[in-house]
Amino acid sequence: MSVKLACYVTASVTVATLMVCFMTMSTIYSEVDGFREKLDTEMNVFRQSTNGLWKDIVVIGRSSKRVRRQYEETNATPTPHADGSPSAPPGQPPAVPPVFNQPKTPNGANGNGPTCNCNADNKCPAGPSGPKGVPGVPGLDGVPGLDGVPGVGADDIAPQRESVGCFTCPQGPVGPPGALGRPGPRGLPGPRGQNGNPGRDGQPGHPGEQGSSGQIGKIGEPGPPGEKGRDAEHPIGRPGPKGPRGDQGPTGPAGQNGLHGPPGEPGTVGPEGPSGKQGRQGPDGTQGETGPDGRPGKDAEYCQCPDKSPPSEAVNANRGYRNI
């Protein structure tokens, strides 16, 4: 049901889009036609204006037949010296200043103002340009021109339009990026897509961690006794050659302490060591026993007895002998 609805909606949108396109094309065609008519009208007005200007130019050209003034240098103005005389190159005659004929009446009877009577034989070089003159009096209106000759009848020719082909302008430089526009309206949901192809099997994963040991199962029933096997042959071979000596094994653990051995023989007497420091003074010992009597001593020297002295000096009477 959803696929049919989507088809109907798509068809209706397509028809509406085509109608809008046709209306837009008709509008553009009408605008182009109006622009063409406006351009033709402006071209007709421009053609009439140019025809009128051309007639005015022809009339002015016929009426402006003025006699040219016969002089070679129109802007010849001699440069005066300090004394007021005009300058002239050496070896040439001085220039003759122009003589203006003054009008007979104050306002000029002839209406043309003063006239210039220049010397035609003057060969002086032209002087610097003079100042700009006063604008002249506007001239009289020209005589109306003659009527033109009637034109020859033209043949009936269909107007040919100028065919201008389209031309392609060179691509200009890339402009700066525009501002971010507003998000457009949400479009219609599209038809349901087809089922994708089934994916391929992935690579096997890494082995997981070892699980915990399960409970011990029940002991199975003993199986039936098997058939008797064949007698095996057990040949005894000769011993092989002695192999190479192996590497030294690691150091074994320390053994138990052994028994005390017998005392050894006394060694040789070593050299006398240095004298030690004097030790601290020990405590006084106990008083010893009285010793035996000593031997008789030597005879003492006889001293002269002192004189008799008063009783105060009798104290020193026992000092008459000295021991040797």
Swiss-Prot record:
Residues 227-236 have a biased composition (Basic and acidic residues). Residues 68-108, 129-324 are annotated as: Disordered. One of its GO terms (cellular component) is collagen trimer. Keywords: Collagen, Cuticle, Disulfide bond, Repeat. InterPro entries: Col_cuticle_N (IPR002486). One of its GO terms (molecular function) is structural constituent of collagen and cuticulin-based cuticle. Residues 87-97 have a biased composition (Pro residues). Residues 127-153, 171-231, 237-299 are annotated as: Triple-helical region. GO terms for biological process: collagen and cuticulin-based cuticle development; cuticle development involved in collagen and cuticulin-based cuticle molting cycle. It comes from the Eukaryota. Transmembrane segments: none annotated. Residues 129-156, 177-201 have a biased composition (Low complexity). Collagen polypeptide chains are complexed within the cuticle by disulfide bonds and other types of covalent cross-links. Belongs to the cuticular collagen family. Nematode cuticles are composed largely of collagen-like proteins. The cuticle functions both as an exoskeleton and as a barrier to protect the worm from its environment. This is a collagen critical for organismal morphogenesis. Mutations in sqt-1 can lengthen, shorten, or helically twist the entire animal. This is Cuticle collagen sqt-1. It comes from Caenorhabditis elegans.
